[in-house]
């Protein structure tokens, strides 16, 4: 019985999400995520030759189970081996339902573990295709850190904006009391009208400039305007208070997960008295009843080659709460 392992990171919500034009002029849903190092999912897949069933632990990780099943068929065909069953085990620390890509992290770690069990190196594009097939829309976590405009429902890159987002310090917080959001209950994206696409394309151009110039102020502007547009789909009662705090403490802007309650205030790492600004921000959040979570820097993770790199052995650890449907439950993010 050969076991394979895989890992995947998560993110801290989106910098930009909306409807954009692809190279053929089609309207396509796309997003740019804010990478977050330190949290993620670790998967281990054990092949069971002579069996057909595929199981997963915890049992409620159905998207990861589907992804493992699809990856099994692909890897078996790639290696010209007979199809078999196996067991997938997942451990991780990504809070569920806050908009941090927990399901995508599970799915991508599962695909990587199956590929490792077969000794197959899947290209990131293949991992993206399997991830979208398993969960209908996937975050670009398989692409490990570049600043990308990614079509989450098609599993392809619309634009490579550059090696990394501009440097920024992010003071994380949780809106809605840290309650999880049932993403399946969110309204389906409405067809983009003639005013939506130009607005998002304008922000896309500004983000392109921000990445090229490593301009954190322009990054903060794009993130704030994208979050403001998203208020029409998933309104946050604290949004006005959040932007008000940003203005008072000298933040560059705010970013809000577009399918959850995690949010952040962005600061210039070179700002005068940065520590004082961060402390003032956390005090202002507490006074407003918005729990602060952790503070981190936007730093790129390892770059991806044309094929998936090895992701090492899975480490045992305390799993995140196994049930994704705890809508009223507050989730605490570990300090980084």
For each feature predicted by the language model, list its residue ranges.
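ATP-binding N-lobe of GHMP and related small-molecule kinases
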Residues: 1-98, 308, 321-323, 327-336
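Short beta-strand scaffold segments in enzyme catalytic cores
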Residues: 12-18, 41-45, 139-142, 147-150, ...
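Gly/Ser-rich catalytic serine loop of serine hydrolases
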Residues: 93-105, 139
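DPxDG-like acidic metal-binding loop motif
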Residues: 100-124
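ATP-dependent small-molecule kinase catalytic core of the GHMP/sugar-kinase superfamily
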Residues: 123-249, 268-291, 295-336
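Small/polar glycine-rich anion-binding or flexible loop at a beta-alpha turn
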Residues: 239-240, 257-265
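A short linear hydrophobic-aromatic micro-motif
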Residues: 250-255
